[in-house]
Amino acid sequence: MWREDLPLIELNNFEALQIGLASPEQIREWSRGEVKKPETINYRTLKPEKDGLFCERIFGPIKDWECHCGKYKRVRYKGIVCDRCGVEVTKSKVRRERMGHIELAAPVSHIWYFKGIPSRMGLILDMSPRSLEKVLYFASYVVLDPKETPLLKKQLLSEKEYRESVDKYGEEAFDAEMGAEAVKKLLAEIDLEQLSKELKEALKTSTGQKKVRTIRRLEVVESFRKSTNRPEWMIIDVIPVIPPDLRPMVQLDGGRFATSDLNDLYRRVINRNNRLKKLLDLGAPDIIVRNEKRMLQEAVDALIDNGRRGRPVTGPGNRPLKSLSDMLKGKQGRFRQNLLGKRVDYSGRSVIVVGPELKMYQCGLPKEMALELFKPFVMKKLVESGAAHNIKSSKKMVERVMPQVWDVLEEVISEHPVLLNRAPTLHRLGIQAFQPVLVEGRAIKLHPLVCTAYNADFDGDQMAVHVPLSVEAQAEARFLMLAANNILKPSDGKPVCVPTQDMILGSYYLTLDKDGVKGEGKIFSNPDEVMMAYQTGAINIHAKIKVRMTKEKDGKIISGIIETTPGKLIFNDSIPQDLGFVDRSNPENEFKLEIDFLVTKKNLGKIIDKCYTKYGATETSTMLDKIKARGYHYSTIGAITISVSDMTVPESKNRLLSDTDLAVEKIEKMYRRGFISEDERYERVIEKWTQTTEDVANALMDNLDRFNPIFMMADSGARGSKSQIKQLAGMRGLMANPSGKIIELPIRASFREGLDVLEYFISTHGARKGNADTALKTADSGYLTRRLVDVSQDVIVREEDCGSTHGYEVSEIKEGNEVIETLTERLTGRYSIEDIVDPQTGEVIVPADTYMNADLAEKVEKHGVKKVNIRSVFTCKSKHGVCAKCYGMNMATANKINIGESVGIVAAQSIGEPGTQLTMRTFHTGGVAGADITQGLPRVEELFEARKPKGLAIITEVAGTVKLEETKKKRIVHVIDDEGVDKSYDIPFGSRIKVSNGSRIEAGDEITEGSVNPHDILAIKGPKEVKNYLLSEVQKVYRLQGVDINDKHLEVVVRQMTRKVKIKESGDTELLPGTLVDVFDFEEVNEKIRQQGGEEATGDIALLGITKAALATDSFLSAASFQETTRVLTDAAIKGKSDPLLGLKENVIIGKLIPAGTGMMRYRSIKLNTDKEENDEELVNVDEA
């Protein structure tokens, strides 16, 4: 069936995609003809050779509507097959889809099924891959039918043994052959039903290694039994030849040809095949034929997967040729290069410059770029307005850039948002929509407040522009992606558009007050008078003054006097006066300014937060624009600059240094006299110098004037920090050597005084290590994000309420005594599952099934509640994705989540994006063996991959009382349970014991310090505890680095890691022991068996690392495009898997709309009923999919 015959709609309207083994008949059916010659194109005429790899008769004409010999040219002969050359007159595009085939003279095995791990062919035949290899590559005979002889079926015979057997029993007494033919016969006579029964019987009695192998064999046998595949199809009789335009040959300038590697590989196969045919016709001696067959087998192996077995076939310059498998694999393969990410039309890129005059939702687009991007729209408009008569002349107008084109362009872009994207796009805020404004020059102008989200600066960064074309796309861009609507960060719900640098500095400068400046103590009758006085220079901007304020209340005009500064008045002008910073219910505060404090970065964040909660995005973005304008203006007027003279070295520095020198001398003396050890001396010296550095820094900070520009920059949070000021004007302090150990000679100088050579040299260690770390970290973090996206990409909010009755109990997360995450943070935006009651009075604070906003959550914590049961993603019952109630609040909008939101991707981005901020280093604890605890990024990876951690803690499997015992050789901890049974644990030296003698511990508690293996927690405490452990451990790493991530993102990923059940006993079900099954499928199967009164299957929740979990997904397309492409496809093909296309990746690959947001089935199939007779409310008939 060819494309032309298919109605167009069908191509994009399929429910699922199935993969399977191709039978020889199927391959011949696909093919348009046999490729018989290895020739490609004629070197003189440059036309394809007949019957060759580029033959026009098989694959279609090279030029549109023109046959090979030239008898038929032009469209009018469409569909005619030329009687001279046999080429069909049609479009040359068919050369991208028509296939050919090669009839092999001898069958060969398909390397994927013979060489993959585990070898599928080996399993189904119950032969080891090594013996199989001997047969396939003509090293041994295999007995096909022993008949009456004492030989065994499938027994291997070497050349010598074979000849001896022939002499002994005679030529006809038994059947033994070699090569793929023999294997094909063995495969063809397998009775799958019978074999399946036998294996199931064997499974009941076998144990250990044997059981594992039986299960593996059964898995392969069942795959073949349940699919329509036949085992003998793993041996190839016919090879498909892919269309020539997918393995092109192009002429280079020098007249030479460049060709795809596949052509070389096909040529080798055809050459060897033809030679083999000839040899068989001639009746050549067996040994020659056998050699040729082996070479054909190797040629086919190289074509399918070069380098999988033996040395790869190389091209010029010893480069291995790219085989069909390599075309799919890796970052440059078909999946990741062309299917998941494509280059698109209507896009451009350019350097970005700052546009402080823009509104929050605007961006500046260079004129010539805009004209090129909106060309078709401009052309259409020109024709409509009558400036051009037809589309051709309007195209000419645009290309010649006539003056009237610009007015039309203005009109076209006025309501047409564009998308701006900066690579690397680490989270969804890396692509936002803006209303374009035409600008001169060639640079894109960007609003300064969106820089944080893009992580952009103006030192030469580039950005890409994309144009949403359809009306729907424009609407989505405007409502969902407009920069003014994306004020909150999806990862933690805090504002991402907080003003930075100059804007903070200006606001800080405005809200400062100063004693004894011009105009202090003056009283003004209204704010306008203050502004007049300030503008005429009568008062200073920081002067403390009094002003009479008036406002209207209940229709009456009331007034009152407040004390403030002109700066604060100006700043408050841009802020709504009811954000809740001032308690307005108190009459004294009636006229008080809303922002009556010093504005720093932190406070600005609070202002934006409150404004967003109260007024929403639009109002907030206007406020931000006002703050931006004021900030820039007054930081310029304030003329806050930085110079060497601003760095004042504290007078007490020299005294502090000499004091420390004396103290260190004392410590040295004690060491020399043997009072303290080398380690102790080192520790004390380091401690002394650390203290001194701290003292110098404090002296410096006390010394600085409040109006010192450097102090202002650091204090306001505009730029720099206390530690940087310390280095500029205090002393640099202690540095580490390349191994991470601290050098005990501190750097005494500050940058202001200048470093000497030794000091400078010591400084370089840290700097270099920092650079190396950053480079490594970026790659690691990127790879972590990729795995996270892959594991959680199909988690979409698919229903309103899954009806789950189980909750997840949360309390604050602590590390030692330090609270890492408060209860309020964990409750905000969640649903309660039961009544939350006050522990003292027993009154209900929050009824069951109530959505808790920040205020409610805070109220719960204030009432002294310690633990709360909430709806959580962990306990969600939705089979695919999650439900809105278990998920709770959408962090990016601070409202309840909508159905169709792709929360999986957002979760992965929220965890991955801050990855680069986490450290790489392992903390060394004073050289104690086995106590290196991993932190930062490697720790996060360790947790998500569910690996056995470094610095493993020993945990107890039973609850009981502790008894410590120390011998010369080792330390032992005994745990005596309630029955008096003693379980002992050996503790290696160097581990620190956490428990004390006689203390009571529960199962799963740590005996020594370190990280616990999550698999142990799962085994001892169960799935609930392990989820909790993973969540709080990842949170600890991020929080210690000052990165806030909301729990729900981690919950989404951890849930994906614990979705599978490992089957123990299969009972009366079809499930095989040892296999992984989805939790919901497992329950479904058991429910069916239960109704029939059979024996249910048993199994335990398995904890998979994110890589494993991503590969264990139902969708083979998603798994194959992630990692281990060949393995995934081999497996899927044998099982005849069908991909239900539920996730995002699968749909991107096949080019459908993703099933999230407006792409969900329920929105795609909306029909408008025009029948007015029906009820008016039910105008839109939403088809629930």
UniProtKB/Swiss-Prot annotation:
Keyword Nucleotidyltransferase: yes
Cofactor note: Binds 1 Mg(2+) ion per subunit.
The protein's name in its UniProt record: DNA-directed RNA polymerase subunit beta'
MF term (GO), any: DNA-directed RNA polymerase activity
GO cellular component, one term: DNA-directed RNA polymerase complex
Entry-linked CDD domains: RNAP_beta'_C (cd02655), RNAP_beta'_N (cd01609)
Quaternary structure and interacting proteins, as annotated: The RNAP catalytic core consists of 2 alpha, 1 beta, 1 beta' and 1 omega subunit. When a sigma factor is associated with the core the holoenzyme is formed, which can initiate transcription.
Recorded catalytic activity of this chain's protein: RNA(n) + a ribonucleoside 5'-triphosphate = RNA(n+1) + diphosphate
Record EC number: 2.7.7.6
UniProt binding sites for Zn(2+) 1: C67, C69, C82, C85
Any Pfam family hit: RNA_pol_Rpb1_2
Gene Ontology biological process: DNA-templated transcription
InterPro entries named among the record's database cross-references: DNA-dir_RpoC_beta_prime, DNA-dir_RpoC_beta_prime_bact, RNA_pol_asu, RNA_pol_N, RNA_pol_Rpb1_1, RNA_pol_Rpb1_3, RNA_pol_Rpb1_3_sf, RNA_pol_Rpb1_4
Binding positions (Mg(2+)): D457, D459, D461
Lineage: superkingdom: Bacteria
Function field: DNA-dependent RNA polymerase catalyzes the transcription of DNA into RNA using the four ribonucleoside triphosphates as substrates.
Necessary cofactors: Mg(2+); Zn(2+)
Residues reported to bind Zn(2+) 2: C802, C876, C883, C886
Family: Belongs to the RNA polymerase beta' chain family.
Keywords: DNA-directed RNA polymerase, Magnesium, Metal-binding, Nucleotidyltransferase, Transcription, Transferase, Zinc
